[in-house]
Amino acid sequence: MKKFRNWVTFAVVLAMVLSLAVGVSANTRSKPAGIYGTIRGSSYQSTSNINLLNTTTNVDKNEDDAYFAIYVEFTNLSGVTSRETRSSGRGATSFNPSFAIYFTIDTVPSYAFVSHDIRGGTVAPSGYSCYTEAPVSI
């Protein structure tokens, strides 16, 4: 039994080292966003804390007093493991929230899908979106 436990410990440590060696896999997208210029979004798993998904969202200008809404859906082969949303204050031109990644025995997410939205303005209330995705691992 002790030999098996040592082998499992070695395998877990090796997997963690290899995941760090791969580096950050960031996904960045941008698209035209009307009166806001361009909306840009990025998402990636933190290298300093693997339990965090970092996101960045920005627009060229926000004279419409709109706000950012960032939606994250963590998934694995079995389906969705969790969902979270964060919103900025009105009038911001950038918003960079981080989201907790929950690794449990029952649910280990393997991917994060992110919707980067700007909405709620007076001229363009329905807003604009761009979408990113990022692999996540232990």
Write out the residue ranges for each language-model feature.
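N-terminal prepro-regions of secreted/extracellular proteins
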Residues: 1-49
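Intrinsically disordered, low-complexity segments of exported/surface proteins
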Residues: 24-25, 58, 82, 126-133, ...
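Short, surface-exposed binding/anchoring microloops in extracellular/periplasmic proteins
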Residues: 28-77
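Extracellular and organelle-lumenal recognition/adhesion modules and their flexible linkers in secreted
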Residues: 37, 92, 128
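Extracellular and analogous surface-interaction loops
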Residues: 44-47, 102-106
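Solvent-exposed serine/threonine-rich low-complexity stretches and specific carbohydrate-binding patches
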Residues: 79-95
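Exposed aromatic-hydrophobic patches
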Residues: 93-105
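Short, exposed beta-strand-loop hairpins at the edges of beta-sheets
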Residues: 103-108, 112-137
